[in-house]
A protein has these predicted regions:
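Helical "lid/coupling" subdomains associated with nucleotide-phosphate turnover
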Residues: 2-23, 40-50, 54-86, 101-252
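Signal peptide-proximal N-terminal region
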Residues: 24-28
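Glycine-rich beta-to-alpha transition loops that act as phosphate-gripper elements at the mouths
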Residues: 39-40, 92
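A short acidic Gly-Thr/Ser loop motif
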Residues: 90-96, 149-152
Length: 252
């Protein structure tokens, strides 16, 4: 889609079949919604695809990049209200990178960059990310955190651990702390993007949770149905990878 800027007819048909199968598997009267992100919103034939799916009874909400960023930021505020300091939240998807910057729980700005692991291919164009060097420099360096989410972030974190780039963790803990080692060694498509983001943002910690846009959409649906603030029940232990970064080594 990112190369041709079009959703092939075969993929539209396949999506219909997947949605129909999913709908059939749900108990009757189960509330559900369908949301589409960067690939759908950038496709030149999105109106045609949207109409065809609607004709089959499937109403799709096409999210903007800023709507994605807001959903994810809202999720983390609900789930981890104790997060403090200056936090940059980066959610990397297939076609876009959603960013939210907050200080002491106050949102400062949000942005959506045309940078994703499927769009990037083997050599990602980091120019949209490099443009943030000056805005980053204006933010206080003290108590900086970077929260990276999405499937690419989880894959990156798991590869860092499995390849021994991080040492063994302490069993039974929901937050694992690791000392910083070269992050580019993880052979994932997202490693270059995340490594450059760390070099630019210079955080004291990187947090890699296992929740992201999907959970943000679920939380949003729950709050719409209940008409009140909600919080997802994620179990007693939410898997989180927390990486401590000695500042002298961030740029290495």
């Amino acid at each position: 889609v990112f190369r041709d800027q079009s959703i092939p007819t075969a993929q539209i048909l396949a999506l219909q079949q997947v949605l129909q199968s999913f709908q059939n598997s749900l108990p009757q009267d189960t509330p559900w919604s369908i949301s589409a992100t960067s690939a759908f919103r950038e496709a030149k034939n999105r109106d045609e695809a949207h109409h065809e799916l609607a004709r089959q009874g499937f109403q799709i909400q096409i999210l903007t990049g800023l709507e994605e960023a807001d959903l994810i930021h809202h999720l983390f505020r609900r789930q981890w209200p104790e997060l403090s300091g200056t936090t940059l939240h980066a959610d990397l998807g297939g076609g876009s990178l959603e960013l939210s910057l907050e200080k002491d729980a106050q949102l400062l700005w949000q942005d959506s960059l045309p940078l994703g692991v499927l769009r990037a291919g083997k050599r990602p164009d980091l120019s949209s990310l490099e443009a943030l060097t000056e805005p980053f420099a204006k933010v206080s360096l003290s108590h900086r955190q970077l929260v990276v989410s999405g499937g690419s972030a989880r894959e990156w974190g798991e590869r860092l651990v499995s390849e021994g780039i991080f040492g063994a963790h302490e069993p039974g803990r929901s937050i694992f702390e690791y000392q910083f080692l070269p992050l580019r060694k993880a052979k994932t498509r997202s490693a270059t993007i995340f490594s450059r983001l760390i070099e630019m943002w210079k955080p004291e910690q990187v947090v890699i949770p296992r929740i992201g846009l999907k959970e943000g959409l679920l939380l949003n649906l729950a709050e719409q149905l209940s008409n009140e603030e909600c919080r997802l029940s994620l179990g007693k232990e939410v898997p989180v990878l927390q990486v401590n970064l000695p500042q002298a080594e961030v740029g290495s």
